[in-house]
């Protein structure tokens, strides 16, 4: 398997278009992660079925979040995407998140060319309010059976805040 951090750039952040590699399909309870050391996907653990991912979950290549992993992405699509699929995506916001005391932000995006929705999603405000609630509930509670209170969505940010999070993550990658 090719190393996504070698073959893909983060994308055109200023234009709000990023490259995304999908790790976990929407609806999956398998915690699949990109293992940078071996350049392959790895099953980290199986979550309880009630904590299946509410969206596709992936990362932006050549970025590092404050937790030391590639910057996470919540990718909104009508149907689940397979592990290993990569695409250009449009940034629509950021979910500011703390996991076990570490910043672990999630960039929220949609496919850059989404003819199904007519490219209707340009900001978090364009998403169904109930989807935002479901995502927030998931991330506030998905570790509750093992470590109650260890995760917290602190707030939702707009496209510009998301771009700044991405820029900082690119800087961390380049300085590693």
From Swiss-Prot:
Entry keyword Metal-binding: yes
Disulfide bonds: none
Keyword Magnesium: yes
Binding of Mg(2+) 2, residues: 72
Protein localization: Cytoplasm
SUPFAM superfamilies assigned to the protein according to its UniProt record, in alphabetical order: Inorganic pyrophosphatase
GO molecular function: inorganic diphosphate phosphatase activity; magnesium ion binding
PROSITE patterns associated with the record: PPASE
Reactions it catalyzes: diphosphate + H2O = 2 phosphate + H(+)
GO cellular component terms attached to this protein's record: cytosol
Similarity comment text for this entry: Belongs to the PPase family.
Quaternary state and interactors: Homohexamer.
Protein name as annotated: Inorganic pyrophosphatase
Organism name: Haemophilus influenzae (strain ATCC 51907 / DSM 11121 / KW20 / Rd)
Gene: ppa
């Amino acid at each position: 398997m090719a190393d996504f951090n070698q073959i893909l750039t983060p994308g055109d952040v200023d234009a709000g278009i990023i490259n995304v590699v999908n790790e976990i399909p929407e609806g999956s309870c398998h915690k699949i992660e990109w293992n940078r050391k071996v350049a392959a996907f790895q099953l980290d653990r199986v979550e309880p079925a009630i904590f299946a991912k509410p969206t596709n979950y992936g990362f932006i290549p050549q970025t590092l979040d404050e937790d030391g992993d590639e910057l996470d992405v919540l990718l909104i699509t009508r149907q689940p995407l397979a592990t290993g699929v990569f695409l250009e995506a449009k940034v629509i916001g950021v979910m500011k998140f703390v996991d076990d005391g570490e910043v672990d932000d999630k960039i929220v995006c949609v496919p850059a060319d989404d003819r199904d929705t007519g490219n209707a999603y340009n900001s978090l405000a364009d998403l169904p309010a109930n989807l935002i609630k479901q995502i927030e509930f998931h991330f506030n509670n998905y570790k509750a059976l093992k470590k109650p209170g260890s995760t917290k969505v602190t707030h939702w940010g707009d496209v510009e805040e998301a771009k700044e999070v991405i820029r900082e993550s690119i800087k961390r990658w380049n300085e590693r």
